[in-house]
Curated annotation (Swiss-Prot):
GO terms for cellular component: ribonucleoprotein complex; ribosome. InterPro entries: Ribosomal_bL28/bL31-like_sf (IPR034704), Ribosomal_bL31 (IPR002150), Ribosomal_bL31_A (IPR027491), Ribosomal_bL31_sf (IPR042105). Part of the 50S ribosomal subunit. This is Large ribosomal subunit protein bL31. It holds the Pfam family Ribosomal_L31. GO terms for molecular function: rRNA binding; structural constituent of ribosome. It comes from the Bacteria. HAMAP family: Ribosomal_bL31_1. It comes from Brucella anthropi (strain ATCC 49188 / DSM 6882 / CCUG 24695 / JCM 21032 / LMG 3331 / NBRC 15819 / NCTC 12168 / Alc 37) (Ochrobactrum anthropi). Binds the 23S rRNA.
Length: 73
């Protein structure tokens, strides 16, 4: 492996949406940083069977519904 071309690989704390915390190694941030997740396997519709409501991040879902909601498809 070539020296000085790879990003720093260090330990960070990840906090899931339910408050569960765990330590992992990552190239994100710097040593000891905390990553707070907005969506994780316990809240993502792909893993929960779509039973939870979809987050409207930045109004994209609302914009889509306003534009195409009255097509009646």
């Amino acid at each position: 492996m070539k020296a000085n071309i790879h990003p720093d690989y260090h330990t960070i704390k990840v906090v899931m949406t339910d408050g569960t915390e765990y330590m992992t190694r990552s190239t994100w941030g710097k040593e000891g940083d905390t990553m707070n997740l907005d969506i994780d396997p316990t809240t993502h519709p792909a893993w929960t069977g779509g039973s939870q409501t979809l987050l409207d991040r930045g109004g994209r879902v609302t914009k889509f519904k306003n534009r195409f909601g009255n097509l009646g498809i």
